[in-house]
């Protein structure tokens, strides 16, 4: 197999992985679980310091297994019940008794959370204490990337800042473009990429859960009611929007099921998966074709998102849905050129969507970007595309660079303003 393809598979396996619960509070739970393990006993106090963006994305989302919202319960639950070896599934097993113990720690004023000044977008430092013993765990650059561990003030592990690599820079130094992703997905041996089919299984179960039970705003179930009442039809567009939103409903509502995440985001993993799976069902393609389309969607999303910080004022579901739309064109028998048209169309349609934290209404944003993916792939199949208008260039690679430039240079102050509004 080509070395370039091996790199691509390595990238996907690094950042397309199961995650239980919204990844920002789960980062705090993971850090707390590692700190508890380092301490050797359950702590009697926990101090949490996080970056503004991690704080923003933890304010309104439920922590799985707890029925509660926020960083304090995430950290306390991680320290009491977390599995430090489980990564983003750190809270996969937690009992009501452990939740009560975590809440008691919070009620006693023994868990503190504060924002801290840092240049890192993903940053979480947890200090766990028991008597005169103290363990510090610092996460930096990625939701499970441990940068430092200290026990009683002594360093037991550290990563040099020049060696640390944030998840957002995962494509740095890699020969990768939309065209190379497209060719790779079409030509790589099926056996090498079969693993991606787990995304369909995990995110499909989340969607089923969101349809079966009331979570969050019940976006998916509301659409189902509209179909049952004859107000809207059960066509491909509405089915994609309904089932994608339902998975996000369940995830944001604290369902105790993992999502197959994409670059640290469960919702974006959902957006990269479910529209592609439903399109594959519509066109009755083989399992192999579905796997190739999922690889195209997930790696395409990773590549586009590598052009800007992992957390920002920009809602990443937009570009994730652009990559999904590219894969949908492939499933429908369209050309590479038409797949590029789909990316251009989605970015033109919904690139103004901001991120104002992880919460129940994220399901609405997921449904918005997924509906754009359907419209855009249909337009692309008819060779209708946005080109040379606004931030959309005549070339898809230039458009992707424009998105990165807009976010890096134009949206940092937007992010600050959003966080200030949310914290007021």
UniProtKB/Swiss-Prot annotation:
Q: Which InterPro entries match?
A: Ser_deHydtase-like_asu, UPF0597
- A GO BP annotation: L-cysteine catabolic process to pyruvate
Out of the domains of life, which is the source?
Answer: Bacteria
GO MF annotation list: L-cysteine desulfhydrase activity
Q: Looking at the Swiss-Prot or TrEMBL record, what is one Pfam family this protein matches? A: SDH_alpha
**Family assignment?**
Belongs to the UPF0597 family.
What is the protein named?
UPF0597 protein Shew185_3080
């Amino acid at each position: 197999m080509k070395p370039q393809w091996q790199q691509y598979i390595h990238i996907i396996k690094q950042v397309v992985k199961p995650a239980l619960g919204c990844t920002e509070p789960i980062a705090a739970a993971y850090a707390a679980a590692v700190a508890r393990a380092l301490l050797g006993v359950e702590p009697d106090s926990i101090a949490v310091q996080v970056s503004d963006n991690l704080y923003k994305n933890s304010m309104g989302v439920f922590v799985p297994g707890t029925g509660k919202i926020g960083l304090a319960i995430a950290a306390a639950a991680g320290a009491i019940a977390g599995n430090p070896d489980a990564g983003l599934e750190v809270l996969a097993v937690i009992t009501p008794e452990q939740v009560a113990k975590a809440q008691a720690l919070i009620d006693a004023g023994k868990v503190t959370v504060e924002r801290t000044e840092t240049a890192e977008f993903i940053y979480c430092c947890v200090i766990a204490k028991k008597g005169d013993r103290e363990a510090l765990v610092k996460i930096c650059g990625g939701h499970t990337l441990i940068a430092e561990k200290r026990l009683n003030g002594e360093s037991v592990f550290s990563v040099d800042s020049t060696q640390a690599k944030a998840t957002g820079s995962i494509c740095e130094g890699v020969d990768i473009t939309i065209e190379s992703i497209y060719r790779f997905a079409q030509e790589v041996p099926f056996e090498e990429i079969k693993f991606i089919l787990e995304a369909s299984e995990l995110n499909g179960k989340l969607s089923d859960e969101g349809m079966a039970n009331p979570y969050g705003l019940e976006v998916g179930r509301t659409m189902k009611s509209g179909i049952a009442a004859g107000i809207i039809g059960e066509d491909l567009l509405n089915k994609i929007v309904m089932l994608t939103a339902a998975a996000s409903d369940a995830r944001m509502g604290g369902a105790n099921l993992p999502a197959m995440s994409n670059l640290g985001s469960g919702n974006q993993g959902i957006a990269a998966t479910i529209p592609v799976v439903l399109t594959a069902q519509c066109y009755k393609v083989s399992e192999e074709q579905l796997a190739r389309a999922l690889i195209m969607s997930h790696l395409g999303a990773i590549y586009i998102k590598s052009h800007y910080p992992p957390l920002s004022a920009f809602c990443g579901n937009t570009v994730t849905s652009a990559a999904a739309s590219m894969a949908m064109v492939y499933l429908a028998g369209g050309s590479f050129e038409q797949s590029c048209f789909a990316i251009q169309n989605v970015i033109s349609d919904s690139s103004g969507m901001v991120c104002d934290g992880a919460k129940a209404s994220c399901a609405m944003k997921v449904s918005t970007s997924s509906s754009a993916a359907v419209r855009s792939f249909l337009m692309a199949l008819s060779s209708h595309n946005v080109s040379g208008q606004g931030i959309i260039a005549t070339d898809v690679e230039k458009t992707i660079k424009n998105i990165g430039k807009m976010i890096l240079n134009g949206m940092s102050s937007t992010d600050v303003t959003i966080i200030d509004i949310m914290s007021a």
